[in-house]
Amino acid sequence: MWGRGFLQRARFAQLSPSSSSSRSLLSAASAAPPNLLYSHYQRGRWFGCSTANMAPVRDPNTLSNYDAWRTRHTTANLKIDFTAKCLRGSVILELESQTDKASKEIVLDSSYVTVNSIKLNSAPSLWETKARTEPNGSPVHIAVPEGAAKGEVVKVEIELATTDKCTALQWLTPAQTSDKAAPFMFSQCQAIHARSLFPCQDTPDVKSTYDFNITSPYVVVASGVPVPDETKDLGEEKLYKFQQKVPIPSYLFALSSGEIASAPVGKRSCVCTGPNELKASQWELEGDMDKFLEAAEKIVFPYRWGEYNVLVLPPSFPYGGMENPIFTFATPTIISGDKQNIDVIAHELAHSWSGNLVTSCSWEHFWLNEGWTMYLERRILASIHGGDAHFDFSAIRGWKALEEAIKEYGEDHEFTKLCISHKGIDPDDAFSTVPYEKGFHFVWSLDRLVGRENFDKFIPYYFGKWSNKSLDSYEFKDTFLEFFSAPEYSDLKDKIASIDWEGRFHSTGLPPKPEFDTSLADVCYELAEKWKSKDFTPSPSDVASWTGNQVLVFLNAVQDFEEPLTVEQSQALGKAYGLSESKNAELKAAYYHIAMRSKDASAYQGVADLLGEVGRMKFVRPLFRGLNKVDRELALKTFEKNREFYHPICRQMVEKDLGVSEAANSS
Ligand SMILES: [Zn+2]
C-alpha cells in the first residue's frame, strides 16, 4: 500500500472523532507491555504444535484456527447492491484439514457481517458467531462433528450480507465522482478488513485461489483476471467473472464497481477509470508500464500474474494506492499531466513480488512486504531514470519521512521497531512509514554489505524460494544466511557474521544512517539558499531539467525558511516555475503552502479550486488548515461547497480540523 500513515489516522478518527491519533498510538503501545511482546508468536512457534507437521498459528490478528484447517480455494458469489450499500450472496471456502480428525470445528474471522446460514459439504451445519472482541472481531465457529482426515477438503458455504458497519467498503455518491452520473464503490481489505466482507481466515499466513462471480448494474473490477466471455447480462445487471489462480492472502481480495472505462497502456496493461479521465490517464501511464514491468522483471524474475492493470479511482479516493493483484487501485493524483507522480505505480507493481507473491506471515513482519517494496521501487525507478544518484535521492526523501515519523512517535516507541508486536493491536493503528523506510534501510544495508552483484543473485533466490508462501523475519534471516553460506561467498563470512539481526529487528528509533549520494538533493538546497536573498531573480531555467520530486524538495526547503517569502517573491516563484498552472497536485499544494505563508491573497482562490479537485487526505487536510489560518471564511465556504465531494472519512477529518464538527461544537 502507499498510504503513508494516513490510513491509520483516518480509521481511528472514524471510530472516535474526538480523539487524537497520537493518543491512539500511545494507548495501543501501553496495551502491550514489553514482557508480552511476541509471546503469542513465540507460543505458536515453540509450543503451539500439537500435531506433527502442523504449522502453528503465528498471527495475533486472527482468531481462526488455521493451524487445523487451511483455505485452499474461495468462491465469492456476491451481488453489489448500490441502493442498500451492501454486498450480499454466498462465499464458499474450501478448507483442507491439517489434522487427522483431531479438529472438530472450523473457526473463521468475521467483523460486522451478517451470516444467514452455513452449510458444511452441502448440508446445514451447526455454527455460532461469538461475542466481539477488539481488535479482531467476532469469530464464527462451525462444527465439523466427525472432523476430517489430514489432507481432506471440506466445503463451507456461507450465506451473508455486509452491514453498514462494514469497514472494508466505501460507497461514493454520484456527486463524489467526476462525471457525477453514477455511484461508485471500492473495497480496501488491508490490513484486517476482509473479515468485514465475509467470514474467512483473515491472515496473511493463509493463501487461497479465488473465483469471483460478481453481479452489479455497473462495470466490476476485482483482484483476479477477467473472464470476459463469461460476463452475463441479467437484465439491469451483469454478472462479471474473474479468476485468481495465484494463491493470495485475504487482504488482497478487492472489488470495485461504477462507470469504469478502460484503455490499453502497455503490452500487458490497461488503465481503468471514469470515462472523463480515461484519456489523461492513458497518456500518463502509456509507455512507462512496459518499462516498469521490464525493469522489475530484470531485477527479480518474470511477472507471474498475467495482466498488470491500474484502476484510477475517483478524485475523492482519500489514499495513495493499494497493490490489489491484477488491478492496482490508485489515487487520481498520479494523473498529474507531467508523468511525475507515477512512482506510486512502480511501488504497487513491485508488490507483485514483495507482498503479493512473497508475503509477511503477520502484520508483525509487515516490513518484509513494504521494506522490500521500497527497495524494489527505488531499483526500478533508478534503472529507468538513470542510476544510483536517483536511488539515493529517493532514499534521502524517505529518510526524512522516517526521521519525522520516529520523532512523532518518540524514539523509544514500540511502533518504531522493524518487528512490531501486534498482540492486542489493530494493525491499522501500528501503520506508519516505519516498516517502509526502516525496512528499506535494512534491505539496502544487506545489499551494500554483500555487494550489488551478489545481492542481485540473492533477490531471485529469495523470491523464488518463498513464492506463494508467507514467512516471518527469522525465516528471512535463515534464507539469507543459507544463500550466503555457499562456498563461493566464503570471503563474505566475517561480514555476514557481523549482521546484528536482533538489533535490526527489535531496536526502536532510527537505524544506522548510511552515506547518501546527495548530488540530486544538493542542487535543490542550493537553489533554496538563493531564495533567501530578496533580490534573487528567478528564471524557468533554474528548475527546467529537474524532476518533479526535486522541485518538491526545493519547495519544502523554502517552506521551512524561518522568514516567509514576501508576497512579491511568492508570486515570482509561482510564475517563474509554472507552479500555479501545474496540474501536479504535489507541486501545486507545496507552492500554495508557501503562498499562504506569505499571505499572498491572490493565491487563495487557487487553493479553494484545488480543494474542489482532489480528495486525497495528504493534500486536503493540510491545505484546509493553511487556508483556515489566512482566510477562514473562504475555508468554510470551500468546505461547504465540496462537502459531498469528499470521502466521509476525509470530510470528518476536515470538520475536525476546521472546528465545525458536531464533536467540536459540543465540547
Ligand atoms: Zn506498499
Swiss-Prot record:
Names of required cofactors: Zn(2+)
Entries under SUPFAM superfamilies matching the protein: ARM repeat, Leukotriene A4 hydrolase N-terminal domain, Metalloproteases ('zincins'), catalytic domain
Protein localization: Cytoplasm; Nucleus
Gene Ontology BP terms: cytoplasm to vacuole targeting by the NVT pathway; lipid metabolic process; peptide catabolic process; protein catabolic process; proteolysis
Segments crossing the lipid bilayer: none
E.C. designation(s): 3.4.11.-, 3.3.2.10
Binding-site residues for Zn(2+), renumbered to this chain: 347, 351, 370
Name of the protein in question: Leucine aminopeptidase 2
Organism encoding this protein: Neurospora crassa (strain ATCC 24698 / 74-OR23-1A / CBS 708.71 / DSM 1257 / FGSC 987)
Highest classification ranks of the organism: Eukaryota, Fungi, Dikarya, Ascomycota, Pezizomycotina
